[in-house]
UniProtKB/Swiss-Prot annotation:
Pfam families tied to this protein: KilA-N (PF04383)
Domain of life: Eukaryota
Keywords: Conidiation, DNA-binding, Nucleus, Sporulation, Transcription, Transcription regulation, Virulence
GO annotation (BP), single: positive regulation of transcription by RNA polymerase II
Name the record gives this protein: Cell pattern formation-associated protein STU1
Native organism: Pyricularia oryzae (strain 70-15 / ATCC MYA-4617 / FGSC 8958) (Rice blast fungus)
Residue spans binding DNA: 144-165
Annotated Low complexity bias: 48-59, 494-512
GO molecular function: DNA-binding transcription factor activity; sequence-specific DNA binding
Region (Disordered) location: 13-105, 229-355, 390-618
Primary location recorded for the protein, binned into one broad class: nucleus
Gene name in the database record: STU1
GO cellular component, one term: nucleus
Biased composition (Basic and acidic residues): 438-451
Keyword field contains Nucleus: yes
Amino acid sequence: MNQGHDMYYQQHMSAGPTQQPPTVTSYNPQPPIMQPSHGSYPAPPQPYGGYPYTNGMPSPQGPPVPGQMGPGSVLPSIAGHHGQAPGPVANQYSGFDTSGQIAPPGMKPRVTATLWEDEGSLCFQVEARGVCVARREDNHMINGTKLLNVAGMTRGRRDGILKSEKMRHVVKIGPMHLKGVWIPFERALDFANKEKITELLYPLFVHNISALLYHPANQNRNNQLMAAAERRKAETGGMRNPQGPPGLPALHHHSMSQNGSQSLSGNIGRPSLDRAHTFPTPPTSASSAVNMGSSDSFTWPPHQAMSNGQQNPMSIDTSLSNTRSMPTTPATTPPGSTLQSMQAYPPASQSYDGSRQLYNAPQLQQSPYQPTSTSPQDRSLYNQATYVKSEMGPPSARPMGSVLPGDHQNDQKPVNGLMHPPQGADQGHNNGVEDEADHEHDPEYTHDSRTYDNSQSQYNYTAPPVSSISSEQAHVSTDMPPGGQHGNSGRSTPRSAAAPQAYYQQAYSTSPRSATHQSTSNLYNVMSNDRGSTTNGSANGDVYSQSTDLSNGYATPVTNGNANLKRGRDDDDDRSSSSGQMDLKRRKTLMDNPISSPVYETMNRPAAAIAHPVSRRR
């Protein structure tokens, strides 16, 4: 355990025979036994050869005398050799001492101090092999984890040793160099001696380690650091114990209290400015930490009364800590304006209520539509959003001359948005009973004029009020001919009826109407004015032609195929001038076809009719 020290004690001593204490003479071949009373080692035996030193000075006969090592030396003295070892020799070879009190040869003390705010203690730090080992000032405990890291010990062995310690303090939070397992001073010295790192850690084990900070080379700096550490320690201790002595203000260089500042002003070692070493720089709002005279305007009235009426520095320190932790806003905003600004919120909430009334206003704008919803003709306008679009025909049992605006497509104009039987049943039902029966299905229109064009609301002409659904025959206009007498249009649109359903597509529904009266879009009606007054036999037909169905440009297919055959023949006649013989061959082929039928003719003719305009556009 201590063989490394044995080689430094030689046989060729310059003075007298070597006499060992009687307790160790019987243990010459073995390492010395550590005395439990002191926790260190006795003088080792000398069985090894000499060790040549470069300076040629003789080796001492034994360890240095305790009087030369200062208080705290626990090595036993050798009889008859008190005072024979000179001072320079003792200082030169004190690195081989296991007490760690004297510096190794040529080694300057390198120690730093830091304030451990979590524990409220000053810590001395010594760096060895890139590891910072700390020692507390209050109880002199040493960070055993960092100590064993200096020895290069593995983590498993280190943790096993530290867990076996009876007295230990585990620190898991805080700065990195302060975390670990803290062990007492004596146990740390034992570990350092076992691992032979005592001289590397000098001056960690020096008892009066704080005196090394006052080196003449850095006297001013060390004075500032120690004074700041002491005041910080007193401040943290006072904050933890509010009943502490009143003579310890937080910052002595501010005249906060008369008794505390006068008692501390007599200290000569105080620096002129040491606030930067005490705590981090406070925010700009904490100007009271720099100038107490100007801080009266930045503190709240309760603290003003406290600082003016009392001379207790601890209460002033409380106000200082509150001022340091305050943001910049309370430094410029008085409490009165803050309360006024908080009272300004209820009017804002009332303005939100007013804005809700603004959003409720469109409901009032929709009030003109409310009276019309009670009439039967408007029930088919506004109650249509829940049904699926269908390709079936219009309602079947309406009279031809009805004045309801939803009836202008009863006769032969199918609407693809209705869920009713096809138009075949339109002409035979004119009595009021079946008309009333069909009225039950009027709300099944799947289109609403509002969803297509909001500008159509100007054409929502309100018909004369209908008293009863079943008595619609009494409200038929007398100036209108029957529905069948309208010219070839095939529609029974009354002259006084509104047409709210504006853009219904006629795309693929079957209709027996002629191609000359195919309905076109409103855009073409406005631009070309083809519909005129001759469509429905009225001079004001253009007003109501806006409500006709929007055509998609396709010809209306008929089940018997007559319209498409007619168009195909017209196209063939037009094309016969350019391709006469091709047309003859094609007709001959079609006539010679033994399986020709109207279905086959219908399927072939639109192909020729569609292909021809493409060739003509070229």
